[in-house]
Each structure stands twice: as structure tokens, then as C-alpha cells.
Design a protein with these regions (language model features):
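N-terminal glycine-rich phosphate-binding loop for ADP-containing cofactors
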Residues: 1-186
Length: 186
């Protein structure tokens, strides 16, 4: 956000709004302040967020803001487990019993592999190897595969065979409990 405001006459009047998909449904809004953002601009941004009926958090202007830093580490453990040889369905369903509204790969399908790859590459480049880039996600993007799940003829959600064919085939699978523990400790 700070880079985008460079050269503006009033960089103190710039904030970033980070919405979550689908915007009309997801209540969270991250408001990113730059080192130059003044309190009046932040207050205006908060009022806009209230008018939009959003729940706001103020974030430092940094790669990934708050949610993407947390989510990328969390999701990274799921994709790492899969890349190491854990079957996708075990990795994807390991957290069902702790109350998430959807599985990691259902979320991945909402966000899209291109966005997921961009976020992980950005965080890896700016924050280091703790934010690993999944070879599977890279292959999905390179081959144009857009979802982990598709709907069959009856409308039931099933694994996308094109995605399954591109998944890493490691030889060190984890159990569902191991996947859950590593994701929660990320």
C-alpha cells in the first residue's frame, strides 16, 4: 500500500482495504495503515467499513497483512502433508472435527490456485522459507487446473481427476491426527 501511495501529494490519506471472498458474504475487512496514514484517514476507513457492515481489524502494511500470514502457514502445512504423500482426502478432512466452515481445499477452490500461489510466493519472497511454495499448487497453476473439486453429473462434489493427477506423490504420509496437529501448530 505504501508503494502504491509513493509520489502522491497526500500519502497520509491512503489506506488499504483487504476484503475476503465472497465479499458480499464474508464480514472481515483488514484495513492496512502505512507508516504515513494519519488517524483521520483511519477513522474514515473504519466508518466506511461500518457502513459496509464489516468486522474490521487494523493491519500493518506488510506482505499478507494478518489473515494471509496465518492462513498461508496453516494451509501450507496441509499442502506440505499432501506433497509428502498424505492422500489429499486425509489432508483435506483432518480438521473437520474442530469447526471450520469448510475444508482447506474447499477454501482453496473459492480463492483459486492462482491467488493461492501468488500469496505463497509473495510471503516466501518477503518472509522466507517458513512460507513454502507447494510444488503441487505450482503445477496446478501451470497446467491451468482451477479447482481441487468438481461436480459430477448428479451435482455431488467429487475430486477433480486433473488435480489429483498433478498432486505430489511423496512417500512419507501422515495420519489425519498428525496433519491436524501440524496445521494447528503452524
Amino acid at each position: 500500500v505504501e508503494k502504491m501511495s509513493a509520489g502522491l501529494q497526500h500519502p497520509n490519506r491512503v489506506v488499504g482495504f483487504h476484503f475476503f471472498n465472497p465479499v458480499a458474504v464474508m464480514p472481515l475487512l483488514e484495513i492496512a495503515r502505512t507508516p504515513h496514514t494519519d488517524d483521520e484517514t483511519t477513522a474514515t476507513a473504519i466508518n466506511v467499513g461500518k457502513d459496509l457492515k464489516k468486522t474490521m481489524v487494523i493491519a500493518k502494511d506488510a506482505p499478507g497483512f494478518i489473515v494471509n500470514r496465518l492462513l498461508t502457514r496453516f494451509m501450507g502445512e496441509i499442502t506440505d502433508a499432501m506433497d509428502e504423500g498424505t492422500p489429499y482426502d486425509i489432508a483435506d478432512n483432518a480438521l473437520r472435527d474442530i469447526g471450520f466452515p469448510m475444508t482447506p481445499f474447499e477454501l482453496f477452490d473459492l480463492v483459486g490456485p492462482g491467488v493461492a500461489l501468488h500469496v505463497s510466493e509473495t510471503l516466501n519472497a518477503n518472509l522466507g522459507p517458513r512460507y513454502r511454495v507447494s510444488p503441487t499448487i505450482q503445477r496446478l497453476v501451470e497446467k491451468g487446473v482451477r479447482t481441487i473439486y468438481i461436480k459430477d453429473e448428479s451435482g455431488k462434489k467429487v475430486p477433480n481427476p486433473d488435480a489429483l493427477a498433478l498432486m505430489e506423490k511423496g512417500n512419507n504420509p501422515s495420519t489425519a491426527e498428525q496433519v491436524k496437529n501440524r496445521a494447528l501448530k503452524a
